[in-house]
């Protein structure tokens, strides 16, 4: 049981790291000397040093991506906190429903953010020769992992 709990905690922390990195790092869209994330657009020189950074568009679609990514982090942190609280207060045989629901909500929020970005990014990125960066891919990787950990929490029963 201890090994199972450790595995679940490691999975949850991995999801949190993926969510934080994908939200913070400036690599959602890259190409031809520029890198774009949810917060700013940066141009780089041939040597790789950052030349100019300016705030991202105030487009409402981009703001919805920002909001849902932040919500996914909040839900996942809250889920981890609730898991530790329930670990010590839940009666024997009880299930971690609340923890699982918040983790599933985190997964759905990150899926919504990545989907909105995929569909609507041409509206605020006019450069069509770019490609998706690693932070965008990390967001998509965090989605199934968050759902998986949420389902594991819902199925998991507390033992002594």
UniProtKB/Swiss-Prot annotation:
Record-linked InterPro entries: PMP-22/EMP/MP20-like (IPR050579), PMP22 (IPR003936), PMP22/EMP/MP20/Claudin (IPR004031), PMP22_EMP_MP20 (IPR004032)
Membrane side Cytoplasmic: residue ranges: 1, 92-95, 157-160
Post-translational modification remark: The N-terminus is blocked.
Membrane-crossing segments per the record: 2-31, 65-91, 96-119, 134-156
Function: Might be involved in growth regulation, and in myelinization in the peripheral nervous system.
UniProt-annotated glycosylation sites, renumbered to this chain: 41
Extracellular side: 32-64, 120-133
One Pfam family this sequence matches: PMP22_Claudin
Organism annotation: Bos taurus (Bovine)
GO biological process, one term: regulation of cell cycle
UniProt keyword DNA-binding, yes or no: no
Protein's UniProt name: Peripheral myelin protein 22
């Amino acid at each position: 049981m201890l090994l199972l709990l450790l595995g679940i905690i490691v999975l949850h922390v991995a999801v949190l790291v993926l969510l934080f990195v994908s939200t913070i790092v400036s690599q959602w869209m890259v190409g031809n000397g520029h890198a774009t994330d949810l917060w700013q657009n940066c141009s780089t020189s041939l040597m790789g040093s950052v030349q100019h950074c300016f705030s991202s568009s105030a487009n409402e679609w981009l703001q919805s991506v920002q909001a849902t990514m932040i919500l996914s982090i909040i839900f996942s942190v809250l889920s981890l906190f609730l898991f530790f609280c329930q670990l010590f207060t839940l009666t024997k045989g009880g299930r971690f429903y609340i923890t699982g629901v918040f983790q599933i909500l985190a997964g759905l929020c990150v899926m919504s953010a990545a989907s909105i970005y995929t569909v609507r990014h041409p509206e605020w990125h006019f450069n069509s020769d770019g490609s998706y960066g690693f932070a965008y891919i990390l967001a998509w990787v965090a989605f199934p992992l968050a759902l998986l950990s949420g389902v594991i929490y819902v199925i998991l029963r507390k033992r002594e």
